[in-house]
């Protein structure tokens, strides 16, 4: 495994509050790293599958830091120190800030959050059977400040606390006395 998504278990829990697809390994970061390095020592090429969980992208899932998480960056640095070729297979639902990775990792394959056939497609690319010639639908920024601000107003109260959901919703037609409505010009709709 190499590492957990994040070193802080509580933050990891909040980051994946809309789905619990992550299964945290309770071993220490050092134990996980040592295991990954032992496997890497027996390998000719290292394929590091890193990035975000799918729950970290989408509504109410904003991050102030769009770099790789601390545990993943440490794992990647240690894998590169082995001197073996490293391919970063990046799973993400949004552009990340990858300045360090771009400068240090020989090959980065961005696979987004692919579907059930992703393993076959990624394998075809890694083994050279298919050229990864797709065009990116977005630009990966050099810093968070380069990303346009689309949500520039106060938080609406989400995410809700564990177990708290909207309890009631009501929708009604409103009866209005039409004699009170005055239209100055004809309207079209």
Descriptions of predicted regions:
Residues 6-24, 91-184, 188:
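Secreted, periplasmic, or luminal enzymes acting at the cell surface/secretory milieu
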Residues 22-27, 64-67:
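Short, flexible loop segments at the rims of nucleotide/cofactor-binding pockets, characterized by
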Residues 52-69:
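Glycine/threonine-rich flexible loop motifs
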Residues 31, 35-38, 70-74, 78, ...:
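Extracytoplasmic/secreted proteins, especially bacterial periplasmic and envelope-associated proteins
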Residues 82-86, 105:
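A short helix->loop->beta-strand "cap" motif at the edges of active sites that frequently abuts
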Residues 43:
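An anion/phosphate-binding loop that grips the pyrophosphate of nucleotide cofactors and donors
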Residues 1-5:
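Catalytic alpha/large subunits of respiratory electron-transfer oxidoreductases
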């Amino acid at each position: 495994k190499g590492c957990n998504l994040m070193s802080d278990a509580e933050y990891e829990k909040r980051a994946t509050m809309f789905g619990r697809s992550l299964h945290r390994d309770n071993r220490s970061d050092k134990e996980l790293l040592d295991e990954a390095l032992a496997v890497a020592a027996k390998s000719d090429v290292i394929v590091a599958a890193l990035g975000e969980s799918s729950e970290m992208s989408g509504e109410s899932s904003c991050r102030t830091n769009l770099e790789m998480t601390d545990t993943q960056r440490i794992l990647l640095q240690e894998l590169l120190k082995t001197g073996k070729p490293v391919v970063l297979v990046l799973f993400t639902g949004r552009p990340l800030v990858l300045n360090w990775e771009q400068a240090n990792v020989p090959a980065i394959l961005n696979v987004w959050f692919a579907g059930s056939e992703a393993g076959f497609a990624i394998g075809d690319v890694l083994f050279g059977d298919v050229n990864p010639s797709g065009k990116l639908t977005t630009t990966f920024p050099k810093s968070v400040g380069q990303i346009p601000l689309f949500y520039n107003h106060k938080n609406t109260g989400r995410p809700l606390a564990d177990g708290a959901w909207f309890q009631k919703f009501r929708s009604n037609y409103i009866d209005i006395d039409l004699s009170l409505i005055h239209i100055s010009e004809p309207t079209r709709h």
